[in-house]
Amino acid sequence: MANSKSAKKRALQSEKRRQHNASRRSMLRTYVKKVIAAIKAGDHKTATEAFAVAQPIVDRMATKGLIHKNKAARQKARLNAKIKAIAA
């Protein structure tokens, strides 16, 4: 338990940040899942549109520090490769 005034404040800030990050992480996963669902359905047009929406969000979360920039790059590359595979 926080004993000092500053420790109590840090605990409150930490909890607030945790909730904010959880919300952002959930949003990110939702957009990525939409792309994956379109890929599994075999719908190239919908998958491409969903990817176009998800891509800047993945980049933004990497910039904000929610995910590592390499993870963002890897995620985008894998999704794009799967979209190209269903087009062929």
From Swiss-Prot:
It comes from the Bacteria. One of its GO terms (cellular component) is cytosol. Keywords: Ribonucleoprotein, Ribosomal protein, RNA-binding, rRNA-binding. GO terms for molecular function: small ribosomal subunit rRNA binding; structural constituent of ribosome. SUPFAM superfamilies: Ribosomal protein S20 (SSF46992). InterPro entries: Ribosomal_bS20, Ribosomal_bS20_sf. Binds directly to 16S ribosomal RNA. Belongs to the bacterial ribosomal protein bS20 family. PANTHER family: 30S RIBOSOMAL PROTEIN S20, SMALL RIBOSOMAL SUBUNIT PROTEIN BS20C. NCBIfam families: S20 (TIGR00029). This is Small ribosomal subunit protein bS20. The lineage of its organism: Bacteria, Pseudomonadati, Pseudomonadota, Gammaproteobacteria, Alteromonadales. The gene is rpsT.
